[in-house]
Curated annotation (Swiss-Prot):
SUBUNIT field: Part of the 30S ribosomal subunit. Forms a tight heterodimer with protein bS6.
Gene encoding the protein: rpsR
Protein name: Small ribosomal subunit protein bS18
GO terms for biological process, alphabetical: translation
Keywords assigned: Ribonucleoprotein, Ribosomal protein, RNA-binding, rRNA-binding
Annotated source species: Francisella philomiragia subsp. philomiragia (strain ATCC 25017 / CCUG 19701 / FSC 153 / O#319-036)
Length: 72
C-alpha cells in the first residue's frame, strides 16, 4: 500500500503561497512547464488553487517559463 500524500503547505502552516518564491513553485511544475495535479503532489484543494494562481502570475511576470524551450 502506498503512503498517503500530505499537503506540504498545511504541514508548514503557510497562509498564502507567494508568486515570488520561484524555487518553491518550480517543484510543482513538470519539465514541460505544466502544473502538476494535486492527486500527484498531495496538495489540498485550497492550496492547489493558490498554487495555480501563483504559478500563472509568475509566468506572466516572466519569473517562470510557460514551456521548457522555444522552437524556431
Amino acid at each position: 500500500m502506498s503512503r498517503r500524500k500530505v499537503c506540504r503547505f498545511t504541514v508548514d502552516g503557510v497562509k498564502e503561497i507567494d508568486y515570488k518564491d520561484v524555487n518553491k513553485l518550480k517543484a510543482y511544475i513538470t519539465e514541460t512547464g505544466k502544473i502538476v495535479p494535486s492527486r500527484v503532489t498531495g496538495t489540498s484543494a485550497k492550496y492547489q488553487r493558490q498554487l495555480a494562481t501563483a504559478i500563472k502570475r509568475a509566468r506572466f511576470l516572466a519569473l517562470l517559463p510557460y514551456c521548457d524551450r522555444h522552437f524556431n
